[in-house]
UniProtKB/Swiss-Prot annotation:
Function field: The edited BmKBTx-like may modulate voltage-gated sodium channels (Nav). The non-edited form is able to form a heterodimer. In orthologs, a heterodimer with LVP beta-chain induces lipolysis in rat adipocytes, which is mediated through the beta-2 adrenergic receptor pathway (ADRB2). Since no LVP beta-chains have been identified in the venom of this scorpion, it is possible that this protein is not involved in a lipolysis process.
Domain notes: Has the structural arrangement of an alpha-helix connected to antiparallel beta-sheets by disulfide bonds (CS-alpha/beta).
Lineage, opening ranks: Eukaryota, Metazoa, Ecdysozoa, Arthropoda, Chelicerata
Keyword Secreted: yes
Family as reported in the entry's similarity comment: Belongs to the long (4 C-C) scorpion toxin superfamily.
Keyword entries, A-Z: Disulfide bond, Ion channel impairing toxin, Neurotoxin, Secreted, Signal, Toxin, Voltage-gated sodium channel impairing toxin
A GO-annotated cellular component: extracellular region
Protein name according to UniProt: Putative sodium channel toxin Ts41
Record-level Gene Ontology MF annotations: sodium channel inhibitor activity; toxin activity
Organism: Tityus serrulatus
Length: 93
């Protein structure tokens, strides 16, 4: 009985730790207005890398016809959020 409870507790702690480690890296599809950045060359390509650099992501590639960025945060997902945050423009100051 004690071994079963101990095993259950250890298993749950391991699962929580794995979820925490795996969920650290954010990512997603950057958006230009409400549309994604379309691409045709699946895999790594210069266009998606440039798009991800624009959105302050770490690395980009084409997946399922849209550019996908590793390390993309929620606040930098939309183009206008990035523009307002990083570009100097007297209209937004």
């Amino acid at each position: 009985m004690k071994i079963g409870v101990l095993f259950t507790i250890i298993s749950m702690l391991c699962l929580l730790e794995v979820r925490k480690i795996c969920s650290k890296k954010e990512g997603g599809y950057p958006r230009y207005f409400s549309f994604g950045y379309k691409c045709q060359n699946w895999g790594t390509n210069e266009y998606c890398r440039t798009v991800c650099q624009l959105h302050k992501g770490e690395y980009g590639y084409c997946y399922a016809g849209d550019c996908y960025c590793e390390g993309l945060t929620e606040e930098n997902r939309l183009f206008w959020n990035v523009y307002r945050k990083y570009c100097k423009n007297p209209l937004f100051d």
